[in-house]
Amino acid sequence: MPSGSGFHNIEEAGEKARKRDDWIAISNFHPGWFSVNMGTGITAILLQNLPYQFPGLHYIAVVLFILNVIIFFLFLTISITRYCLWPDKFKAMLAHPAHSMLLGTFPMGFATIINCIVFICVPVWGEWASRFAWGLWWIDAAVSVAICYFVPFMLMTKHTSSLETMTAAWLLPIVAPVVAAASGGVVADSLQNDTHALITILVCYAMWGSAVPLAMVILVIYFQRLAIHKLVPRAAIVSALLPIGPLGQGGFGLMQLGVVAKRVFPRLDFLAPIAGDIFYVMGAFIAMIMWGFGLIWLWFALASFTRGKFYFNIGWWAFTFPLGVFTTATTQMGKEFNSPFFDILGTFFSIVVTCMWVLVFALTVYKSCTKELFR
């Protein structure tokens, strides 16, 4: 084992590296960068499942999927390197009232990769890809639940915060299990083993129940913060879109889980013969209510953006994922309700998300090359 002086030398080397300009990206990297995965992944999912397809669209989705996988492993490598070189930064991140909230972006970004495996790889590669996605999903679900349970408790016990300094980023660790539950519905729908599918959707309903009501509590507190202290600072104004995330993804998750329940419950004689139909109908009903609730939060966000200028930062990725998951709920309602209205609206939202992804991705690459995002 290294001696005390050996540890000192390691720390000294890490400190010297931190001061070098070419290490600044690793030194100042934080979990919020995984929002790039969230935005890229949801864009690939939307294009793959667009109600109105055209030749070549599938290949664009495949390219984005591959890009997302590359970015994810790049960011994971940078994160591991950062905390190996500067172990104290991990504790500092957990103690930071803002950066700790961004931990939720890691499993949510990973969930988009799992969904793309189901949508893109399973139809080509078959059952083994479905089982592979299922295994990855269990990892994602465990990490999501751990973050959802741990970070809010840190907020209660360790972080110094006030109503005035609150932002919608408080939702991020709580939304992670909502995304995992929705992803579980997608994975379960691809499983050929009905027992595995049943276990998966029951776990998903439990995760949904753990996270969505808590997200609603946060929304109440956030509305009170806005009513009393007015809009958040301009640097964080893009976070105004975050509330539509749990509402859109929560609604999509219930509908997707209902689809699987309708198919699997009768086969396994689970509960009553009509249990699957009840879960399916109730899921669609609650999803419609959540979607409607999301509309007013979307209006609040859009109205907030008109109140003044705001400048680019990594938080701009909130332009993509929250609206993206709201769009998945929209297109799913078009599918389940056989509604051209929701198909057209979902297509419009998908185009908006794709355009925002192009803009934000280009700015992110440029600002990363100039290292402005790391200072």
From Swiss-Prot:
Top-level taxon:
Eukaryota
Q: What induces it?
A: Expression is strongly increased during growth on protein rich medium containing keratin or cystine-arginine.
Where in or outside the cell? Cell membrane
* Ranges annotated as spanning the membrane: 26-46, 60-80, 102-122, 136-156, 168-188, 201-221, 235-255, 278-298, 310-330, 344-364
Q: Which residues are glycosylated?
A: N193
Q: What membrane topology is given? A: Multi-pass membrane protein
Sorted alphabetically, which keywords does the UniProt record give? Cell membrane, Glycoprotein, Membrane, Transmembrane, Transmembrane helix, Transport
- Coiled-coil region(s) at which residues? none
- A GO-annotated cellular component: plasma membrane
Record keyword Transport present: yes
Record GO terms (molecular function): sulfite transmembrane transporter activity
Which InterPro entries does UniProt cross-reference here? SLAC1/Mae1/Ssu1/TehA (IPR004695), Sulfite_efflux_TDT (IPR051629), Voltage-dep_anion_channel_sf (IPR038665)
Q: Does the keyword Metal-binding apply?
A: no
Mapped to this chain, the residue ranges on the Cytoplasmic side of the membrane are 1-25, 81-101, 157-167, 222-234, 299-309, 365-375
Extracellular-side segments: 47-59, 123-135, 189-200, 256-277, 331-343
Main localization, broad class: membrane
Of which family is this protein a member? Belongs to the tellurite-resistance/dicarboxylate transporter (TDT) family.
| Summary of the function given for this chain in its UniProt record | Sulphite efflux pump required for the secretion of sulphite as a reducing agent. In the presence of sulphite, cystine in keratin is directly cleaved to cysteine and S-sulphocysteine, and thereby, reduced proteins become accessible to hydrolysis by a variety of secreted endo- and exoproteases. Excretion of sulphite mediated by an efflux pump also represents a detoxification pathway for dermatophytes during infection of the epidermal stratum corneum, hair and nails, which are rich in cysteine.
- Descriptive protein name: Sulfite efflux pump SSU1
Instruction: Give the organism the record lists.
Output: Trichophyton rubrum
